[in-house]
Amino acid sequence: MKPKFFLIVLPFMLNAVMCYAEKTHIIEPAEFEITYSIKEQPFWDIYIFRCGKKASQYFCQAKLKRNIMLANDDPAYFILSNEEMKDLNTPEYEKKYPLSTGNNDRIYRNLEQGKISTYSTVFGTHYLITEDISIPDWTIYEDSTLTVLGMECKKATTNFRGRYWEAWYTEEIPIGQGPWKLCGLPGMILKANCPKFMLIEAISIKNKNLDPVTFYNYLNYKYAPIERMEYLKKVHKPGIYPTGGNHRTIEIDDN
């Protein structure tokens, strides 16, 4: 993307412009990037948080790699898929293959407009949920600390979108963002735990040789705009999959 064009489209890129088959393109240069490990027993996954001056993104690393392979007709994609199918019912499956709730979601924050956009795929249907950035109601514990990647982090807790979260944030990175939709603390969230569900923890931070904040849509999906509550009711409805059952999401307040 040419720099002049980028400056023109930036205020709009996370709003209506992306509602349909927007192609993969650079949003802006990144200032830092955090890699998070996800533990959702018995599964695991790796996510990337990338942040610039005006936008940030959060996505599953493995899903992005697979989409790139599929878009390029890479034979490795089909080899990997066949191996995964063979391992599906074996003890090795959970150790070898990344998997987590929300791994088909890509989350973008437009920091200027105060908007957050989630691009979600559920059984072949593609949704776009755009909403105001919601700040959890945090309780901060100044005297409860731990160290993550050599940085002192303070504890905070909240009930947000139907789940209880314990988070640890560092004021050494004075940006009130975090993994998934967690945000609004006096520093970057490096660790977040939802007991008996999901543990998220930063395993690396870098600020050099970064990929830019990028809108990814290598498969040129068309995303249908939908309200958040309508989306949750739709995907939580039993029988959304042919085998029965519903789609699991991190947020669960759909009543």
Model feature map: region roles:
Residues M1-E28:
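Bacterial Sec-dependent N-terminal signal peptides
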Residues K23-N255:
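Extended soluble regions of mature proteins
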